[in-house]
């Protein structure tokens, strides 16, 4: 989901709304393991340098918070990491701050990496999903953004269904698709 401004002044207003926390975002993600029903992750993160060669330059820790709610869980009869079955959760994620790769890094931090995350996830699980569903995408989808209209100030709520490749993976959960993504 992308939001565009038609002129620099409006872009500045939208950018300011992001900076002061007036923008709310909601994502869906498929993660490894059975995550608790709900929770919050308050784990500071360092900015990741664009140039990986500069990784040795220490960056300051910045506050980072994410809230989550479990939508569904599943256990499939596929042995991936020494267990006879594999467990996954569908979660709704609400970042309260906006750090680079915050959701990916926070989910890894609590031991439930997002499926398809090559940098922060688990290769065996990612390969299984890529082989089973014919694509190796990151299983993270923006589904809602709420922000004040840059001119009138009324709250705008924009919603989007996940793309088809994301929905295809949701067939591992027993709940109907409409219940999972609403």
Stretches with model-predicted labels:
Residues 1-182:
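RNA pseudouridine synthases
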């Amino acid at each position: 989901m992308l939001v565009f401004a038609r002129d620099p002044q409006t872009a500045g207003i939208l950018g300011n709304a992001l900076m002061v926390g007036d923008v709310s975002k909601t994502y869906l993600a498929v993660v490894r393991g059975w995550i608790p029903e709900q929770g919050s992750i308050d784990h500071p993160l360092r900015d990741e340098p664009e140039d990986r060669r500069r990784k040795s330059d220490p960056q300051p820790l910045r506050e980072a918070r994410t809230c989550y709610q479990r939508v569904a869980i599943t256990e499939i009869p596929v042995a991936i990491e020494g267990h006879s079955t594999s467990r996954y959760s569908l979660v709704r994620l609400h970042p309260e701050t906006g750090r680079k790769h915050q959701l990916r890094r926070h989910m890894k931090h609590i031991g439930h990496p997002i499926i398809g995350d090559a940098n922060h996830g688990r290769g065996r699980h990612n390969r299984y999903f890529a082989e089973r569903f014919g694509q190796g995408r990151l299983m993270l989808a923006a589904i809602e953004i709420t922000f004040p209209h840059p001119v009138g100030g009324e709250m705008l709520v924009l919603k989007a269904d996940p793309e088809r490749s994301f929905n295809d993976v949701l067939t591992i959960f027993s709940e109907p698709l409409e219940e999972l993504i609403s």
